[in-house]
Amino acid sequence: MEKSGVARSSVYHHFGGRDGVIAALETTSTMRSLERGTAEFEAFLDTLTSGEKAFELIELGIRSFRSSENKSMRQRRISSLAASHNSAAIREVLAKEQRSGSDVVARIIEKARDNGLCNPIEPILGVAYVIQSMLVGRILVDISEDPALDAQWEDAAIATLRQILRPT
């Protein structure tokens, strides 16, 4: 803020207060982290010739989202979503980042389809948003603090994605 010459009060006002600024920054930080992860996934996907091998990678990813780091990231995303209720500026940041993230996921699915790794049964952008929704919605399992439920969610998510993506 100092370098830009914008007053702190102006930034706070734009995002609806200090919490809004924090939510916007956390959203941007979270999305950058997700982009790095998807870039690594996409690079590895380029080396695969089997849809089943690609799906094993997806399964591993889903099971790794159980980590405390990923739980914290989901908590921050949910907090940002809640903060957006009272701030058009935060909603704008969230919407932009969500569109960007979903476009990346859609591009990966499209590339996998074009490389013969999967044959999605639904429109690719819709599938990308379903995947994003599943990952954020996992917060419902997180708050239960039940490891058995965590495993059940993972199994159900994997089965759902297998049906939608249809690995070859």
Pin down the residues of each PLM region.
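Amphipathic alpha-helical packing segments from all-alpha helical-bundle domains
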Residues: L34-E35, S68-I78, A88-N115, G126, ...
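Hydrophobic/aromatic-rich alpha-helical bundle segments in the mid-to-C-terminal region
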Residues: R91-A95, R99, R113-L161
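Helix-turn-helix
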Residues: M1-L25
